[in-house]
From Swiss-Prot:
Organism: Camelus bactrianus
Gene: IL13
Assembly mode: Interacts with IL13RA2.
Residues bearing carbohydrate: 38, 49, 57, 72, 75, 131
Cellular component GO terms, alphabetical: extracellular space
Name under which the protein is recorded: Interleukin-13
Length: 136
């Protein structure tokens, strides 16, 4: 009996480690894309006074990395809604000391960052939409 219980607990733990990272709903991802499109569409002046943010690797923890990169941008009402959306999409809570998964070696303008995030979000949405439709 004890051996059986140990096996069940072991499989439960391994299953938890192997389970995929929670993914946002298609609706949440679509709303983020719409917001990013709104930001980039009618932009004439430099976004957020030309503020610079750390470039990130969007292939891992995209929403958390994007949130972390934009966290220090203040007094820029244009991206506040995006920051809130990224905060909701990231399953990890911000700690007092933010530690990054990416190497902080390249800074880019917020405008370029938002455009890159938009393109990557669209790719993720289309890829997931294709896979969701195949499962149906």
């Amino acid at each position: 009996m004890a051996l059986w219980l140990t096996v069940v607990i072991a499989f439960t733990c391994i299953g938890g480690l192997a389970s995929p990272v929670p993914t946002p709903s298609p609706k949440a991802l679509k709303e983020l894309i719409e917001e990013l499109v709104n930001i980039t569409q009618n932009q004439k002046a430099p976004l957020c006074n030309g503020s610079m943010v750390w470039s990130i690797n969007l292939t891992t923890s995209m929403y958390c990395a994007a949130r972390e990169s934009l966290i220090n941008i203040t007094n820029c009402s244009v991206i506040q809604r995006t920051q809130r959306m990224l905060n909701a999409l990231c399953p990890h809570k911000l700690s007092a000391k933010v530690s990054s998964e990416h190497v902080r070696d390249t800074k880019i303008e917020v405008t370029q960052f938002i455009k890159t995030l938009l393109q990557h979000s669209r790719n993720v949405f289309h890829y997931r939409s294709f896979n969701w439709s195949k499962k149906s």
